[in-house]
Each structure stands twice: as C-alpha cells, then as structure tokens.
C-alpha cells in the first residue's frame, strides 16, 4: 500500500508542476509503453517531454521502519543538431552541448522542486530521507534524452506485528 501512496504523490506533483508534461512508473526500459501518460495534451503520443518516471527499486525493513528506495527519472529531449537550424555558438558540437547543458540544468531544478515538496510532508505517513543522490544521464534512449535519476529513500512506519496479517 505504501508504494501506491508514494506513486500517487509523485503523480500529483507531476500533474501540478508547470514544467512536467508526462509521468510514468515501472521498468525504465519500457518507458513509452502503457506505463506512461501524457498529462498535458490530447495527443496520442504517450510521452511529451519533460517526463518524470518512477521505478521502485528495493525495500528493507528495520525495527519499526520499512525503507522503500525509488529511482525517479527527470528527463527531457535534447534537440538534434539538424533541427537547430545551423551552427550555434560557432560550432555545431558546441550548440549541441549548450542544449544538453540547458536540459540538464532544467531537469535538476525540477528534481529539486520534487525533493523539496516530498521532504517532511506532514500530511503523509512516510518521510523522505534527507540525503537524495542525483546521477545525470545523457543520450540514454533512442529519443535523445538527458536528465537526472534521483535515488529517493522513503521511510515508512512498520510495526512488524502479526496482527497486521490478513486472516
């Protein structure tokens, strides 16, 4: 049940964030299939970048706590050199790099917005760990994307009680 609540919180944030157009969950290798929704347009395209995509990675239990680790991908498309209309900043390669850097910068800001919103939310039963690791990625998909993967650890109360087992 806890993963469902975290997934819903991420969807709510994605839907309310003005710079996010699509959201999905599941296996990152299957981004763009039925696990991704377009939040902004009636287009039949499943992904309209920028995209936020969440993948539950692991869970561990300790005395009184369940830790759920979720990888949250913040990604956007990087324009191809051909669509940039020629040479930018003196060199096509530099133009490409400028665009990639802008995408990385924008996606890092969106990731920070999500982290801020998820940290110490008094309305939720879980808390986000104060340390979130962010790892950049570039050109990781066929559709030329760049962005960040935030590894978030959610701490959820767990009593280890047999009374919670359905009968």
Question: What would you call each of these model-derived segments?
Answer:
Residues 1-65, 165-167:
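Small/polar-rich, solvent-exposed N-terminal microdomains that initiate assembly or binding
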Residues 5, 67, 109, 113:
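Short, well-structured alpha-helical interface segments that form or flank functional binding sites
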Residues 17, 21-23, 43-47, 98-157:
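Acidic-leaning, charged glycine-interspersed low-complexity segments
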Residues 64-81, 144-158:
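Oligomerization/assembly interface segments of phage tail-like spikes and tubes
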Residues 80-103:
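A solvent-exposed, charged loop/short amphipathic helix patch at secondary-structure junctions
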């Amino acid at each position: 049940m806890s993963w469902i609540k975290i997934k819903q919180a991420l969807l709510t944030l994605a839907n309310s964030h003005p710079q996010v157009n699509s959201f999905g969950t599941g296996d990152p290798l299957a981004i763009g299939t039925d696990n991704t929704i377009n939040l902004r347009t009636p287009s039949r395209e499943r992904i309209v970048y920028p995209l936020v995509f969440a993948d539950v990675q692991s869970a561990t239990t300790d005395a009184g706590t369940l830790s759920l680790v979720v990888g949250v991908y913040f990604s956007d498309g990087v324009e191809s050199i051909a669509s940039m209309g020629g040479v930018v900043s003196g060199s096509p390669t530099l133009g490409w790099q400028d665009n990639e850097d802008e995408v990385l910068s924008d996606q890092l800001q969106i990731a920070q917005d999500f982290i801020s919103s998820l940290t110490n939310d008094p309305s939720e039963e879980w808390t986000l760990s104060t340390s979130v690791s962010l790892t950049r990625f570039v050109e990781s998909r066929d559709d030329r994307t760049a962005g960040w993967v935030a590894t978030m650890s959610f701490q959820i109360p767990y009593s280890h009680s047999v009374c919670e087992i359905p009968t």
